[in-house]
Amino acid sequence: FRSVEHFQNIREETDGFTPFEKLEYLGNMTLDFLFEHYAVSKISVLTDMQSPKENDNTYRTYAAYLPLVAACRPDLDEAAIRRKTLYLITVMQQMFLRYEVISQTLGIDLRQKENRRNFHIQVLHDILEV
């Protein structure tokens, strides 16, 4: 998942995308990975929440998303960009960890890839206000 070739392919696949489209693509890829590797991903996310470390998976995800959030909203100051990136990562983790409750509450099955994609796009619009 984290191989150099894989990230090079992502760069090539997203070449010409807008910053929002890149963020959407990366988010969908992240969510798909979490759901497709449920057990290990759940342990990883919960470990990051329980014992945060400077370079844990949540931090690395935040670092990867930060420049894309900034590119989507160049009008915002750095503090606002950092907050919005934090909101996005937190919501994505909750979408994953609490998918059953969220699915019941909102009436959408987040185990279904298309439903996840649509919900993720809505979350991006809500958080980024674009």
Language-model segments: what does each one mean?
Residues R2-E36, T85-L88:
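Hydrophobic alpha-helical connector segments
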Residues L66-E78, V91-V130:
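C-terminal peripheral helix-coil segments that are non-catalytic and often amphipathic
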Residues S3, E36-V40, T61-L68, R98:
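Amphipathic, well-ordered alpha-helical segments in soluble domains
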